Amino acid sequence: MKIDTILTVAALLAVCSPSRPAWARESWPEPTEAAKQRVAEFRQHEQDVLKHIQPELEAWAKKGKPFIPWAAKPGDLPQAKVPAFPGAEGGGEFSFGGRGGRIYVVTNLADSGPGTFREACEAAGPRIVVFNVAGIIQLQKPVFIDAPYLTIAGQTAPGDGVCVAGESTLVNAHDVVIRYMRFRRATTNVFDRDDALGGNPVGNIIVDHCSASWGLDENLSMYRHMYSPPGGGKDLKLPTVNITIQWSISSESLNPYNHAFGSTIGGLNSTFHHNLWACNTARNPSVGMYGDFTLVNNVLFNWHHRTVDGGDENSYFNIINNYFKPGPDTPTNDPIRYRILKPEARRAKPPVDDFGKAYVTGNVVEGNEKVTADNWAGGVQIEPLGDPVPLLRGIRTDQPFAHALLTAQSAVEAYQSVLAGAGATLPKRDAVDTRIIDEVRTGKVTYEAGRGIITDISQVGGYPEYQGAPAKDIGADGIPLAWKKKYKLDVNDPDLAGRDLQGDGCTVIEKYLAGLDPTKNIDWSNPRNNVNTLTADTFKPAR
């Protein structure tokens, strides 16, 4: 079917209008002097963190674990020989994380001090963070992850698990693995409009089974980092490289200032699969960088004026087998209702209608049989200065662009898998995610007055309680004594957690975190072994 016969008049009129309606314009008030002072304090705190960790960064560089802040291509960062964890896929699959490093056990919910989340994240050197406390970690200022080689294992928390609240967690390094964590910011101070989880990530990043909500810019954003060259000069905006966000949820970005945005993501060798974007007006998600962008098996629900958009003339989109479900806030008589992708073009200099390329197939738009049957029958929309018909022909490609290894499902299968398994499902799914999943499944939102778009968390019940008693048999290495005894390990070995007993590339604590038998050798060269062994609600891949 020819593109010029399937693009509707309504779509042409919509995409050719450059002005934004009032509801799409942000309305940030001017910050007060007190607010500006608060921002200055946050910036000073990060400078203090950088100064504190610098000697250790230099020491670890001599040990073969350097910080590489100038990375701008996938090959600039070394890759591990085995997956970051069983079930890791995509561009970030071979992140080192904190493998072989010091183990931090989070034992209290304070903002700072010994045994806190901040202490572990703002340290330097390879490190693995486990939890022996449940509850809300109420941050007073952002947490800055400024040193590479970090693994955060939220699945280790007792009871209902933990939730990071009040401020942002900012990833400004490489080789960072974050699993089964909740980041629910909820701050509405205009001076501090930031993401729940974001930052300036360099690369080798994988975010898995995390839940991000109630951000004031976006909920979960990772796509670029700023690099300051030695000797001064202008800071360089570089792409994040080797990144995966998988099995995660970005929901209910706050909208007091017309800015309830889900995510800006991207980078080089970037993969985003089995995620859910729900009840965000826009950026569901937005593509924040040039180059390859692979979006597979995601679910989008209840957007208002933007679904997937962004990129530039050097973008190569794989938009494959995603499920788009309009909600109460999605306009009924507007092309946005069935929009799958809106690629952006060069605007600053000629040629002004220079778009990238897109492989768009297998996506389902619930309620629109035409676009579901043929995603190019109005699902790809542009805002050109010239004739859109030949431009759409030039954007379209019938073969996918090269991307990292990934196990894919149909859009309908992915819809069920995402609702069953996305977000911080361990140690258990919390009331927020349970409610969001129910809203997606039924199409009925909790906050009816805002059609699912909220300005304050009180409109949806606020924070739930997270309860759980600390385990009594967890030592400094973060591994329960009972688990060591179960596998007849040497309980008196102070270095046991960091040992690779089977020579398969995984340490004892990594096998504990992944629910694996530490006495068995795993052949990681067989992709069939790279399966999440922690949760049964994710599908079993057939590789």
Predicted features by range, described:
Residues R25-R99, E448-A449, I453, G462, ...:
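N-terminal pre-domain segments of enzymes
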Residues S27-A59, P66-K73, M289, T294-I457:
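Extracellular beta-rich repeat passengers
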Residues F85-V129, L496:
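Acidic Gly/Asp/Thr-rich repetitive segments characteristic of extracellular carbohydrate-active
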Residues S95, G115-E122, Q138-A147, G166-L170, ...:
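Short, T/G/N/S-enriched strand-turn elements that build extracellular solenoid repeat scaffolds
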Residues I137-T271:
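Right-handed parallel beta-helix
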Residues T151, T156, R182, S211, ...:
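A structural signal for beta-strand register positions
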Residues S168, A196, N219, A260-T264, ...:
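Structural detector of coil-to-beta-strand junctions
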Residues V460-R543:
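Extracellular calcium-associated, cysteine-rich motifs in secreted modular proteins
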